[in-house]
Amino acid sequence: MTLRFGLELVDRLARPLLVIILTIVLIWKGPIFLPIAYSTSGPTILYPGLSFPASFRFAPDGRIFFTEKNTGNIRIIQNGTLVPSPFASLTVATDGLEQGLLGIALSPSFQSDGFVYVYYMGWDGTTYHGRIARFTALGNSGTGRVSIFDVADPTPSTTNHDGGYLRFGPDGKLYVQVGEFADPSQSQNSSSVAGKILRMNPDGTVPSDNPFPNSLVYALGIRNGFGMDFDGQTGQLVETEAGPDRDDEINLIVAGGNYGWPICMDTCSNPSFINPIASFAPVVTPSGIAYASPRRYYFGEWTSASLQKLTLTQSSTVASISQVWSSPNPYNGVTDVVLGPDQKIYFSTSTEIYQYDFSGSAEPTQPSSSWTVIYVAIAVAAVAIAIVLVVSRLRHQKTIDSGPNPLSSVFTFLAARVSG
């Protein structure tokens, strides 16, 4: 009696559950995708054995200029080979992990003026300085060094949060990420260039159309960023920013925008601050980011030693973030990401430069939450079907219906949805 009662109870619960789950599946308006195994060739190492390439850029003739973070050398790769002698060398402060020779940018008019810009941390005997030097390329040698920017670290005893990333915008201006030098109060200090994104003319002077009169400041409330790029269609500036022990961010930068640090992190209710489009917890330390195609970016992660793909919606919200590659060496984090002249993604780690042909690649991605619901629904429906069949058999009853088996119709429908 007890066994029979238990079987009847299971049968009564399983049948309504089956009806509910199958109803959800049947009214679903989108196609039903089943998980498949993706294959992709993945990134390949082009240049191994490098000395901590912090940032790199392509010249119009195909040469790659890159900074060696800890040596202070600017190096060139030409025709697939590292040029033996440095393009130029700087004396840099390397007392902290985040110091050294950092960002690099080539003039938009490089073919005519040969200008190469680098950001580095220097030491004057008492204070650390964030500096931008400009060289003129004469073949593979840098000449005519000129200093166009210098900011003294407001907290001389600190050696981190130096920023240092450089990027020329479609407007021909030089954009600079400057960290707050481990002094959070600098980010909201309008008279300081620390904790900001700066916008300057190629000679270091203030553009007349900057959002704050007579100031290099373009955006404030920045903690410490080392990655930014411009949307190739809209010109939108996108930057990555490292948080403290949580809330790393990806931000859409607008002129005069305030991004909240240190008053708030991640999403803020204060309308004075602009919220990130993505935040990460725990930290991943996002680094270089590159626009690849409409609404698609690739960015590096230092902490997780990986390359990620960011896809945006038409309204510039995050559609998905998925991992494309991770280093077998967890200490070989990604430092910079660049779209090459061949429309392939290039990225550097602490020892190599990689190439990734993302066009036509079937990249491994995580299913969206809506597809996850469908996967779970199908799985639960399968369990419910199994329960009904087992219970019916144990009770030695007749078939569910004297007519055509409804389960057969369901499986036929699902098969048609999947194949269509």
Regions found by a protein language model. Name each.
Residues 11-34:
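Hydrophobic secretory-pathway targeting helix
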Residues 85-97, 145-159, 202-218, 260-280, ...:
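Surface-exposed loop and turn segments in beta-propeller and other repeat-based domains
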